[in-house]
């Protein structure tokens, strides 16, 4: 199967990933310029397996059956894996994206395989990207919405996990409590992919990393500034900063900082420069990416008005992007409330890459599933 893939990618090359061998956390004096894409050959795929819309919570406990950093059964958090594995998955995402963009439809590694998609929280992007991606690679995905499955209420999570494992080859779940995804993975005998929890959103950040590589040329050594609530998106950026060295800044109002334990863990990894600040104007200077998310996530709508008041001064507008500098891109995990956390002008500006970013959800997730299923 991998050999067939290698023959396909020879006619559909994509940007190569750039990760320097330096272990330094920051690269002063390095100027990264904005460009639309890098046209360099990528390595053939290896033969062996390899918010948005959620509120922030405290760090959850870890699953009890953690294996090696490269051969984990599940994809629950980016920093569960080592740097080499994350690089391999991103390489794979780039290759498979190029293959699909070329019109090639004969690479079907998921043929005969099925996936259950559990949605305690609805999401257009998560459902369409997973379902379409799995289909394009030959598989069949089943949607299980809130009315179809209620883990921990109508049926215990451990029972759901063991039943679905007997029907499916892989499970994706988008849930509220992070403990739900940990329990699902612990009792499932097939791989489980974290489609989002209140604690983190690893698939989104993998897509974001792929998007940065395509437009900037690399993740390593860049400056990413997140402006807004220190929520699950920030937690997953911190996960990425634990395995790839770059400069990450979270600019948020006082009282809305990310989980302290999560921040501490990322700093202890010793790879990236990490800052938490309450001054967005100072934070964005020299940024390669300015990133935003909704101020009131799903399950927080009763706090929306209070949050709007608390987040005054944290809107990403044209003036803030000007402070960031000419090389800065704007990214947003979507859905966006235009006129609230970001202006319409910023979303529609030439430096906005929110829609390539949204597309890359599918390609990053395809690569994650290929890795977990041994392709």
Swiss-Prot record:
The residue span given for the transit peptide is 1-53
Tell me the residue numbers annotated for binding L-ornithine: 232, 293, 297-298
Which controlled-vocabulary keywords does the entry list? Answer: Acetylation, Amino-acid biosynthesis, Arginine biosynthesis, Chloroplast, Plastid, Transferase, Transit peptide
Q: Does the keyword Amino-acid biosynthesis apply?
A: yes
Q: Which GO terms describe its molecular function?
A: amino acid binding; ornithine carbamoyltransferase activity
Q: What is its EC number?
A: 2.1.3.3
> Active-site residues?
333
Top-rank taxon, per record:
Eukaryota
Q: Where in the cell is it found?
A: Plastid, Chloroplast
Keyword Nuclease on this protein?
no
Concerning PANTHER family, the annotation shows:
ORNITHINE CARBAMOYLTRANSFERASE, MITOCHONDRIAL, ORNITHINE TRANSCARBAMYLASE, MITOCHONDRIAL
Know the name of this protein?
Ornithine transcarbamylase, chloroplastic
In the UniProt record, the gene name given for this protein reads OTC
